[in-house]
Each structure stands twice: as structure tokens, then as C-alpha cells.
């Protein structure tokens, strides 16, 4: 149970009676499927700002779920089970659709939508989302798809193919949690991207840590050399 400034209660599902991962996943699968059917998923919109761009009204979207009693469940609790059981493509498309609806109602300049490795391999994704945005009478530039650095590194070829397909339709592409592995330079060289989102761990205590300052400066310079914009994670 967690309470923020608006006193939103975050619920922890009791899985103590389910001892194995398979048994626990069975509980989560049932909850996720019922949430999809009963409209108990919703997005949280987190304002973000580029370190270089003058764009305003940009948001990072995160999905959350409510149980049948209305208790809120964080994505870190239910997404792992969805990933293990082939539900991520369905969830990703729900999130994308909800993000497009948000843009249509709010007129946000851009929303950042993270997609899973399952959706990276979804050859119909780019065409599907382009039609979705067209139906909403929005420019494709409102959506920036993002993939974590480690996922992109593990799925280099399909990630490059998807980034290229999305770019052909006018969508933006970003790598998040950037800079925490040795793959950063290689990703910048081999992947087509519009943004990097420097991992929050590098931003914490930045003002007093010269090693972090040097690394962040290097990442920003590498990105700038390739005309890639930089966003800092977890900076308030």
C-alpha cells in the first residue's frame, strides 16, 4: 500500500497461496484478461522535457491496472506475468490506442509509448498504428515509440527494422534507460532513433559526481553528433 500526494492507494495482490511461478501467473493472467474486458486499465501521463528541444506538452505514458475492487496495481507487478504468457502484444496495442485517444483529447505535442520485445517482432504494428492515428485525425509525429536499451541490444535487427518502418510512417523512435550498458555507442551507430532517454541512475547525484558528469556529457555529445535529442529520466 502506497499513498502519494493525491492519496492514490496502490494495491498488492495477495499471491501467498500460489507457490510456483506458474500458479502465480495463472492468477495474474485472469486479472489481466478481466481488466482488458472490463476496462480496468488506465494510463498515467508523466510530463517530460527534452534537454535540447523546445517542445512542450510531451508525456511519458505508463499503464496501471485496477482489480475488481478498484485497488490500483502497478505495472511492475503484472507486466512480468504478461511477458511470460504472451499477453504483451495485446497490452501494447491497448496502451497505444489509449495514448492516441489522450493525444486527441489533450492535443499533446508528443507522447512516449514503450513497447515490448513481442511488439518489436510484430510486423503489422507500424501499419496498424498509422491507421489508428489517421482515424483520430492526428499527425503521426504525436507518437514516439520507445524501447529499453537492453531490449534493443538483445533484438538489434528487429528493432532496427521496426524503427525504420515507424520512421517511414512519420513516427519517432527512442531508446530509454540509455547509457547503463556498454552497448550505448553501438546502438547509436546502428539504430535509427530520434531520442535517447538517459537512465535515471546516471542523473541521480549528477551535480556532485564528476564521473557521472563525464559520462552524461559523453552520451549527450554522441547523440548530438547524430542529430539525436536527449531526455533525462527521473529529473523533476
Which residues does each predicted region cover?
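Signal-transducing alpha-helical linker
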Residues: 20, 24-27, 37, 83, ...
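PAS/PAS-like sensory domains
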Residues: 6-7, 25, 38-44, 89, ...
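Cyclic nucleotide signaling catalytic output domains
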Residues: 1-4, 9-27, 31, 77, ...
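The catalytic core of metal-dependent phosphodiesterases that act on cyclic dinucleotides
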Residues: 132-206, 218-236
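Catalytic core of bacterial c-di-GMP phosphodiesterases, primarily the EAL and HD-GYP domains
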Residues: 55-60, 87-158, 234
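Active-site core of bacterial EAL-family cyclic-dinucleotide phosphodiesterase domains
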Residues: 14-81, 114, 146, 175, ...
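Conserved long alpha-helical elements within nucleotide-processing catalytic cores of c-di-GMP signaling
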Residues: 76-80, 89, 164
Amino acid at each position: 500500500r502506497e499513498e502519494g500526494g493525491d492519496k492514490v492507494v496502490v494495491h498488492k495482490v495477495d499471491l501467498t497461496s500460489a507457490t510456483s511461478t506458474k500458479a502465480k501467473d495463472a492468477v495474474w493472467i485472469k486479472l489481466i484478461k478481466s481488466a482488458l474486458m472490463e476496462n480496468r486499465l488506465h494510463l498515467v501521463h508523466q510530463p517530460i522535457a527534452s534537454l535540447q528541444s523546445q517542445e512542450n506538452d510531451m508525456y511519458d505514458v505508463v499503464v496501471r491496472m485496477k482489480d475488481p475492487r478498484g485497488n490500483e496495481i502497478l505495472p511492475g507487478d503484472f507486466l512480468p506475468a504478461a511477458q511470460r504468457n504472451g499477453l504483451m502484444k495485446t497490452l501494447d496495442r491497448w496502451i497505444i490506442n489509449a495514448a492516441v485517444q489522450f493525444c486527441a483529447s489533450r492535443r499533446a505535442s508528443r507522447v512516449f509509448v514503450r513497447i515490448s520485445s513481442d511488439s518489436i517482432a510484430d510486423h503489422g504494428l507500424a501499419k496498424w498504428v498509422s491507421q489508428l492515428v489517421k482515424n483520430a485525425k492526428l499527425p503521426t509525429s504525436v507518437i514516439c515509440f520507445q524501447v529499453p536499451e537492453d531490449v534493443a541490444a538483445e533484438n538489434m535487427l528487429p528493432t532496427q527494422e521496426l524503427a525504420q518502418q515507424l520512421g517511414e510512417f512519420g513516427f519517432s523512435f527512442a531508446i530509454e534507460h540509455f547509457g547503463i550498458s556498454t552497448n550505448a555507442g553501438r546502438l547509436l551507430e546502428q539504430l535509427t532513433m530520434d531520442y535517447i532517454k538517459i537512465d535515471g541512475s546516471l542523473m541521480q547525484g549528477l551535480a556532485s559526481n564528476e564521473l557521472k558528469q563525464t559520462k552524461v556529457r559523453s552520451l549527450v555529445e554522441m547523440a548530438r553528433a547524430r542529430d539525436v535529442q536527449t531526455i533525462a529520466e527521473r529529473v523533476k
